[in-house]
Amino acid sequence: MTNILSPEKSDNDQELPIRPSYLQEFVGQQQIKENLSVFIKAAKSRNQHLDHTLFYGPPGLGKTTLAKIISNEIGGNFKSTSGPAILKAADLAAILTNLEKNDVLFIDEIHRLNTAVEEILYPAMEDFELDIIIGEGPAARSVKITLPKFTLIGATTRLGLLSNPLRDRFGIPMRLNFYNTEELKKVLNRASKLFDIDLTDSGSEEIAKRSRGTPRIALRLLRRIRDFAAVDGKSRVDKEISDFGLKRLEVDLIGLDSNDYRYLKFIADHYNGGPVGIETIAAALSEERDALEETIEPYLIQIGLLQRTPRGRVITIAAFEHLKMPIPNQSHHQFNIFNENE
């Protein structure tokens, strides 16, 4: 699923080096920043590595950025890979044996590691040792390699898919939450200076409140609205040009786009608001289940338009009102069922 409001990374998101380098520059996630600052200072005061850290939550909220910040704060090298890229245990062994003391190894989509690779990680995380097999058949022997004290940082949008043994080995688990409008305005104002964009306060607010609580989306929208302003001969990005650009991009007043409307209208039109299973929705919309669960549903749930119930997805009365559709008679019964299961 590719669209302007997708929180997933895209090549176009890397236009300028706008990532903050240190905790004091990072906007939002205040509790996480404060706790990380304490943990990092404590580790440095003891001359120890930082405990292995797990960032989880919706995409686009700063998990990779925070991992790089930790690397800068503790003064180690930053090594990055992803779960799908590590196909064999030997691939991970090669990465681990090239680490140095205080290095940060960042594994994105860590929930997609296969079992054989995970088993290599367990002793590496707990004891900083790597057990490898040399040779084949009767001549094969196990060799134990001591690893330097490093920090593993995992990132996942699907915490429930992480195995319990792996999850339990992270000493610092942290959930990243959606941003509010004021926090996104700060992100946009900082970026506007780096992009050399004359962004007014009203323009910043208009973009922020329609960015789905996600910095990555806010920055992407800012770049596109800058394009509309330039072509229209505008020297600044204000509320008027922001609203114009967002309408052209089919982003409505609460940050929904055509994909969200397709999703909501399918449930409303064909299932009277639900409940309906996610597999049915995915098949009907010709989308992957993972794409719906990671890209569309989190924000709809966050703003109260969608509920996940034991019987399936149910859109709320607020969703019907936003769609300007009549509310089916049985809707109140669906929501009562949901509330009873809470």
Curated annotation (Swiss-Prot):
Its EC number is 3.6.4.-. This is Holliday junction branch migration complex subunit RuvB. Residues 253-342 are annotated as: Head domain (RuvB-H). It comes from the Bacteria. It is an enzyme of class 3 (hydrolase). Homohexamer. Forms an RuvA(8)-RuvB(12)-Holliday junction (HJ) complex. HJ DNA is sandwiched between 2 RuvA tetramers; dsDNA enters through RuvA and exits via RuvB. An RuvB hexamer assembles on each DNA strand where it exits the tetramer. Each RuvB hexamer is contacted by two RuvA subunits (via domain III) on 2 adjacent RuvB subunits; this complex drives branch migration. In the full resolvosome a probable DNA-RuvA(4)-RuvB(12)-RuvC(2) complex forms which resolves the HJ. Disulfide bonds: none annotated. It catalyses: ATP + H2O = ADP + phosphate + H(+). ATP binds at residues 18-19, 60, 63-65, 126-128, 169, 179, 216. The gene is ruvB. Residues 180-250 are annotated as: Small ATPAse domain (RuvB-S). GO terms for cellular component: cytoplasm; Holliday junction resolvase complex. Has 3 domains, the large (RuvB-L) and small ATPase (RuvB-S) domains and the C-terminal head (RuvB-H) domain. The head domain binds DNA, while the ATPase domains jointly bind ATP, ADP or are empty depending on the state of the subunit in the translocation cycle. During a single DNA translocation step the structure of each domain remains the same, but their relative positions change. Mg(2+) binds at residue 64. Belongs to the RuvB family. DNA binds at residues 289, 308, 313. Keywords: ATP-binding, Cytoplasm, DNA damage, DNA recombination, DNA repair, DNA-binding, Hydrolase, Nucleotide-binding. InterPro entries: AAA+_ATPase, AAA_lid_4, DNA_helicase_Holl-junc_RuvB, P-loop_NTPase, RuvB-like_N, RuvB_C, WH-like_DNA-bd_sf, WH_DNA-bd_sf. NCBIfam families: PRK00080.1, ruvB. Residues 1-179 are annotated as: Large ATPase domain (RuvB-L). GO terms for molecular function: ATP binding; ATP hydrolysis activity; four-way junction DNA binding; four-way junction helicase activity. The RuvA-RuvB-RuvC complex processes Holliday junction (HJ) DNA during genetic recombination and DNA repair, while the RuvA-RuvB complex plays an important role in the rescue of blocked DNA replication forks via replication fork reversal (RFR). RuvA specifically binds to HJ cruciform DNA, conferring on it an open structure. The RuvB hexamer acts as an ATP-dependent pump, pulling dsDNA into and through the RuvAB complex. RuvB forms 2 homohexamers on either side of HJ DNA bound by 1 or 2 RuvA tetramers; 4 subunits per hexamer contact DNA at a time. GO terms for biological process: DNA recombination; DNA repair. It holds the Pfam family RuvB_N. It is found in: Cytoplasm. It comes from Rickettsia akari (strain Hartford).
